[in-house]
């Protein structure tokens, strides 16, 4: 099951999930991409998103406005839907309308093999890495996440480090091995690091839970601001989004 948490009043870009992306609302684009891989449900917090999804025949459930993270919203949706404890759950974002089918499939495969949870990352350049909106991740020898940050990690002290360690940009999608894992993660107390960085995935690392990271090729960009949206609409074309 794929769940897309969608909040109307995003702090940096209100109503962004309803913004038009070449004739379709952003959240609808995201859901249509997800439906190419598995059954998808939008977990929304407002009737306007619910009605938009219904208009385009996208399955949706109405959840609380008071969740601290998309993961918490996914859990409520999973409970509403009555998912079994052993069902695998993917958490995609409502602001990734350009996410490729191949990336979702890669996440699904990584989740099958991950004991706790999985996510994806892609190689980025130094200029991209400067943006705090693009989260960076560093990995251990088994491609599990060591840390996620809005800052530049690792810091490239020497020129040779550029060749030895590629910079990795996190793609904010998650796979939970089963619903019980999702329950376990949400039951953990929020940690200081996630509050400082505003990155919910740091909770798992703080409590020594493994996050497997699949490195993929992707041109997708997350839409965090109005500027992100305008830039993306210049880069992508309607033909590119046709599946």
UniProtKB/Swiss-Prot annotation:
Gene Ontology cellular component list: cytosol
UniProt main location, coarse: cytoplasm
Highest taxon, organism lineage: Bacteria
Pfam families (UniProt xref): CTP_transf_3
Keywords for this protein: Cytoplasm, Lipopolysaccharide biosynthesis, Nucleotidyltransferase, Transferase
Similarity-based family: Belongs to the KdsB family.
Pathway: Nucleotide-sugar biosynthesis; CMP-3-deoxy-D-manno-octulosonate biosynthesis; CMP-3-deoxy-D-manno-octulosonate from 3-deoxy-D-manno-octulosonate and CTP: step 1/1; Bacterial outer membrane biogenesis; lipopolysaccharide biosynthesis
EC number(s) recorded for this UniProt protein: 2.7.7.38
Cytoplasm in keyword set: yes
NCBIfam families on file: kdsB, PRK05450.1-5
Reaction catalyzed: 3-deoxy-alpha-D-manno-oct-2-ulosonate + CTP = CMP-3-deoxy-beta-D-manno-octulosonate + diphosphate
Cited InterPro entries: Cytidylyl_trans (IPR003329), KdsB (IPR004528), Nucleotide-diphossugar_trans (IPR029044)
A molecular function (GO) term: 3-deoxy-manno-octulosonate cytidylyltransferase activity
Transmembrane helix as UniProt keyword: no
Alphabetical list of SUPFAM superfamilies matching this protein: Nucleotide-diphospho-sugar transferases (SSF53448)
Gene: kdsB
Organism of this sequence: Helicobacter pylori (strain ATCC 700392 / 26695) (Campylobacter pylori)
Subcellular locations according to the entry: Cytoplasm
Name listed for the protein in its UniProt record: 3-deoxy-manno-octulosonate cytidylyltransferase
GO-annotated biological processes: CMP-keto-3-deoxy-D-manno-octulosonic acid biosynthetic process; lipopolysaccharide biosynthetic process
